Amino acid sequence: MGFDAVFDPHNWALVPFHFWSLVFFAFGCIVGSFLNVCIYRMPLDLSVVSPPSHCPHCKYSIPFYLNVPLLTWLTLRGKCKNCGAPISPRYFVVELLTGLAFLACWLAFGHTAPWVALVYCLFLAGLITATFIDFEHFIIPDEITFGGAAVGFVISIFLPQLHGTNSLRESVGRSALGIAIGAGIVYAVLRLGKLLFGRQKIKLPDGAKIIFTETALCLPDSVIPYEEIFYRKTDAIVLQARTVELIDRSYCNVALRLTPEMLKLGDEKFNPEHEPHMDVVCSEIILPREAMGLGDVKFMAGIGAFIGWQGAFFSLLASSLIGSAAGIALILLRKREWSSRMPYGPYIALAAVIWIFGGKKLFDLLFQM
């Protein structure tokens, strides 16, 4: 058999369907191994290509025979072969999840639209990467959001079937509308939420003292770690202080504004890292509060490029329900602090997955009632 026969798509069709199912699962696990690299390196602005895979603890360069998806982590019992340091179970989970996602795409669309199945594999790979990065860092890199929007739009030009049509014009229009409506709706929700709920005003007893330490804000009845206050660099604690006591100086009747990168007292500005302790007397303090950020806006634009405006709209509604259910469940499980620290991107990603595997039928059913 010559190379022409090997690469002839008509011969591929003769291969049993479930053989391709195995291929998609295996290929998904391999892709999942690369996604782990992206999840670890992208938030740190490191190259995902160089250097090759290595242990994050001892920097041991991992040879190819120790870089087999799923099997390596299991056989080494989640430890580095060289130094014995533990390797996060996340590596195994991402590889398995990606393999199952690719398999699901093939089983759902392989019979009727194999190219669409391949595109959805790419789409789900992006969702998985964004989800785990958002969980760990509360950011979604622009390479995923803007990159996803660009890739989804370009694919819509060459594969109209992605949007359920054979018309190039309709496909491009649905992708563009998905980008615009996806980003537009989430941005409107973001601005409205910021306007209505973006600040939490806490009244304090007269003469109450609050303490700013290196790691937390200490109120009279609670201690709030800074990581539960500052989700983004622009978040700020604002108050009008009666007195402010620093280690080497004091202030009276001064406006105080604290962000992760700057402490402002009146017109003076300081590096917060140089002020490890601060006693403040005030009657009211305003803390930042925000459910989603611009990363979620860009993320929805990328999603809309692949699944159109209906999918983007469905994803917004479904993610709200999923987020509410998850928050209530965590509170009932006495994990209230987890519910306040859950990023919104994973809910959007899960809603988009639901759309791909049956959400459109649910959408049509709801709007036909």
Outline where the language-model segments fall:
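A membrane-topology feature that recognizes alpha-helical transmembrane segments
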Residues: 1-369
